[in-house]
Amino acid sequence: MILGNVCTRRCGFCAVQKGAPLAVDYDEPRRVAEACAALGLRYAVITSVNRDDRKDGGAELFALTIEAIRARISACKTEVLVPDFQGSHAAMEIVMNAHPHVLNHNIETVPRLYRQVRLGARYERSLDMLAHARRVRPEIPTKSGLMLGLGETLEEAIRVMRDLRAHGVGILTLGQYLRPSPKHLPILRYVPQQEFDELCDLGRGMGFTHVEAGPLVRSSYHASEAV
């Protein structure tokens, strides 16, 4: 995770510290690249907190990190899990023009639950950013993920999957929401593996090239297998 450990938003599912973040550390891309090299990584997933305090939402540091990894260990593929950059197409273009191997932006939940789950985000804005990523660099696959168990219906989840496909997303992750602490949103349902399997089959039928679905699936789960 780059851009510090303090987030400018207060999503109801997330345990990351909230508040006023520190200044951007421009030596961070070099250190991340050195860590990738030291670990001998062949696939690195880079994510961040939301940085609504910055005009580009932190896009520049994502690009610098991608470039630093490529320069230090060219065999290492990069996947970036980015925030919505407050809907800035220019910010998304900065990231895409650094040529990550996969662009991930999680839709997280169904539109009806956005106010409780993703305070400060908008469903349509996230879809638009995913679509814009494809417009900028159609050769780079896009990815998104959905947490289940927050009160969504099966029909709502399927509609989100269809929306993601309609906006060019090719890689999908579906996982069980797990509550980080008693202060966070409650788990309203534990989704059985059979339902995850059914959604996986549906997703493949919709045209997703790769689907990971199960209670413990997260954004980076088996990420390298999708490319």
Locations of the language-model features?
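Structural motif
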Residues: 35, 49, 79-83
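Acidic/polar active-site rim loop that often engages polyanionic ligands
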Residues: 14, 42, 49
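Conserved alpha-helical substructure of the radical SAM core
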Residues: 18-45
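Hydrophobic residues within beta-strands of alpha/beta enzymes
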Residues: 44-46, 78, 103-105, 172, ...
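Distinct, well-ordered alpha-helical segments
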Residues: 57-60, 88-97
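Canonical Radical SAM [4Fe-4S] cluster-binding loop centered on the CxxxCxxC motif
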Residues: 1-28
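Conserved radical SAM core fold
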Residues: 45-55, 85-88, 101-123, 140-143, ...
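Auxiliary Fe-S-binding modules of radical SAM enzymes
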Residues: 30-40, 64-76, 96-98, 121-227
